[in-house]
Amino acid sequence: MERLHMVSRSAWRRRLLATGAGVMLAAWGSAAGAQVAGPPAPSPVSPTPTAPNLPTTTQSADPAAPPALAGPAANTNTPPSGDQGGPDIVVTGSRITSAGFNAPTPTQVLGAAQLAKNAEPNIFTTVTQLPSLQGSTGATTNTNSTSSGQQGLSSFSLRGLGTIRTLTLLDGQRVVGANVTGVPDISQFPQLLVQRVDVVTGGASASYGSDAVGGVVNFITDKHFEGFKANAAGGLTTYGDDGEALLQAAAGKSFLDGRLHVEVSGEYDHQGGVPAGGFGEQMANGRHWYNTATLVNTGQTNNGSPQYLLKDHAQAYQYTKYGLITAGPLQGTAFDVNGRPFPFNYGSGGVPARNAAGTVNGCYVGFCVGGDLSGNVGIGTTLQSPIDRANGYGRVGFDFAPDNEIYATVNVAQVKSSNQPNPGASKTGLTIQCANPFVPAEVQQACGNAGITSFQYGTSNAILPNIDVHPTRKQYRFVGGADGRFGLLGTDWHYDTYYEHGINITDIHVNNILLNPHFNNAIQATTLNGQVVCANATARAAGCQPLNIIGGGAVPADTLSYVIPENGPFQHTRQTQDAFSASMSGEPLTLPSGPVSLAFGLEWRREAYKVVADPYGNGVSDDSPYSDAYPADPTVSTSGANWYAGNYHDGQGKYHVIEGFAEINVPFLKSERFGSANINAAGRVTNYSTSGTIWAWKVGGTWDTPIEGIRLRAVTSKDVRAPNLSELFAAPISVTVPNFTNPFTTPQSQLLVLQNTIGNSALKPETARNTELGVVLSHTPLLPGFSASFDYYRIRVNGVISTLDAQREVNLCYQGVTELCSAFNLAPASGTPYVNIQSFNLASIFTAGFDIEASYQMSLDRIGLPGRMTIRALATNVRHFITDPGIPGAVAIDTAGANSGNTPSWKLLGTETWDVGKFSFLMQQRWFSDGVFGNQYVVCSAGNCPVSTADHPTIDTNKMPGQFLFDIGGSYSLTKKLQIYAKVDNLFNKSPTGSPQTNTGIDVNQALYDTLGRFYHFGIRYNF
């Protein structure tokens, strides 16, 4: 039966592909016939777009978007004169090609004018300022990572649903992912040729396929650019860092009477980044807002006082900059830079208990407040990753018949970044022998007096160089396709087909990182024949050199090269994406209320990856053998995980998908009395090689009411997100867990298990229901120049892919959650019991809120001033963002308004532009509302607190202020070809609010708050 199933499925795929090929051959044949009928005549307008969702005119898909921001709007109600009937008008969010069609899905538009006025070196920054974008990643995120490779990766998150649930397109086409989660890097796009960016704030899986749960961000390039243009820009912060140097150029020219068009672009961008601070609380280059804000746990849950207290200047008391004895009779003995012992200042009245547990009386669990903060490592994380990016782009298009084009594009890009996760290499819980020759004599004597032979020790390891992570991402993308129109059955049909092959290579190299087995052997020193050597004879034979971690003395070169090898961890990942698409659209039928529009097509895609790591990180394997760079070493584990930080492991996987879709728009009403209305519906059937068949659909409509300028719109959809390569085929990581509880025995027993973190190839796609209702006010007679829209949205995502810890997996199976029971075997017939930590389709997300957009344009001559003024404001209010783990006993959490996350209650963007003659002036406001650390907390004061629970812990304060930023800029045209410009972001140099955690870290939400401070941009543009 399985073989029959596979054969039938394969045959079904072949039939679909054959049908698609037949459609395209018929289309090309019709076009070729048109060419035979007569020579092509040059057209004064651009041919139809090369992607099925792109208009040739830069038109707003939302009437609330003013022309100053979205580009000049075509008159969609009156076709231009001539036989062609005008270019097709297509809006992102729909595959329909029809003049005058208004999609029911809201779309926000950023045109080339607004992108230029914002003067950002990466268009990504401008787009993420839209309120509907929440939780996007960029140069200020992932700066504490050692092995993710996502440092500096620019990716969008709509509605706070995450980058993996936002589909990003280039000219309506998919782009190979920049890492194994499948999200592309916007900084690798040809940015100078971007004509506009459409942001679809609603589900679009029926039109575009997987990942379009939160919406779609579509970058639309100018495919018929003529001439030459260039841009050179620089900038830096008010602190003198993150220096920017940007060079961009593009050229385009037509040949053969306009039938052949060639365009190229290239750019180089350097952003210097903001370095990490050092130890303690000193930030880089004079920034002053960091104060080690921490939620300290009092350990009290039922004494009438808050369990958690917000404390500034918190310090972890398990280590210091140059070393601290953390338990036993010598607890509280710290060491200065010269290795001399002194009593450590714990602050907050802390007194070491000098017991085996390392308790500090007068302090909180794990933390004291104040005292000697010099060893804190939290601020030692890079604040913004430096980035060097370069890309080149080329496109060649040839009109083989009027309004029919074949084309090819190539895009090659590279992004280099780096970051420092933390200073030194903090170590806690170390055991140092009192006889260690590096231990000062007076401490050795104190050991003897106390009757101990060793002590517990912690250090920030300030004697070691800082970890230096270097990820490099390279992209190679090739697209070939054809699009155009032909006549069939008395009407015009538009076709579009393309094949894309994309390659992304990510290389991660880490410098200055400890090899743990070498470090552990090096710190255990002894004296042999009058020389200080490593105590372990096997390690000595393998080249061990002793390391003194007591004090801040210089580390000898041979010791440093032993504990920090010249060749640190590396990880090489190669991803490929192949995609084919063939679609057609037309108007096969005309009703009294207007033409019925139809679009349909087939798509196929294959995704694959392979990652290879070093043998010390991954373990020895065929792909990761020992070598001269990583020689065999008896002290190093052959199963991997030997480095101080990071997960470096081999892995591979692939899947393919084939899809068919159709969309129809039916105008069913058109009268002066009742206005005009249409129904838009789409469906998509998708077959994944990993999870089978799933459907997505959309139904919506618009009603242009009889009240001029007022339109109502509504849409509801079922959207999907398929599991990505990382979730399906994650590289395995294995660790041994002792004292694991087996709930299936009576009484419960403890056993040693092998914990394997792996992918789950049985994952199913996430499904979502997305509903939006809106009203649009556009240029009414009573309010000329004014446009506005209001849209309510509601999204529920089911089967959200999430991960549980090993013990919870086993416990839930015991409690009856049977889908988890295949993930472990605690009583195998042979071998070690194991638990596989995998992702499962267990959780759900619910979010709801509304978007508001308004704009006003006016000529200032009516008030006696020159020029033209445009005002635009966009706002998003998140009413709910509820995440339910979907497991027994777990409580759903609403994070709307939690400014420690991605979804503040309100987010607003306001822009005001004044254009007069050669001068253009811009003001911009960016704001999000005050919020809380988390909605799960119960605020109370000492004496009136309820019982604190894991789901609803008590806290003394729960306020997290928002941020208001003011930007100002302008440009001046020296000539028709030459323009200078300047802009200041965060004019008033507003600092972020701390985002306290229960441990010491950088403690700021870099995805939400501006952490750089005032930034100056300046540049010059040339265009002819």
Which role does the model predict for each range below?
Residues 37-116, 124:
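Short, acidic, small-residue-rich periplasmic hinge/interaction motif at the N-terminus
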Residues 180, 272, 281-289, 338-389, ...:
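Surface-exposed, low-complexity loop segments enriched in small/polar and acidic residues
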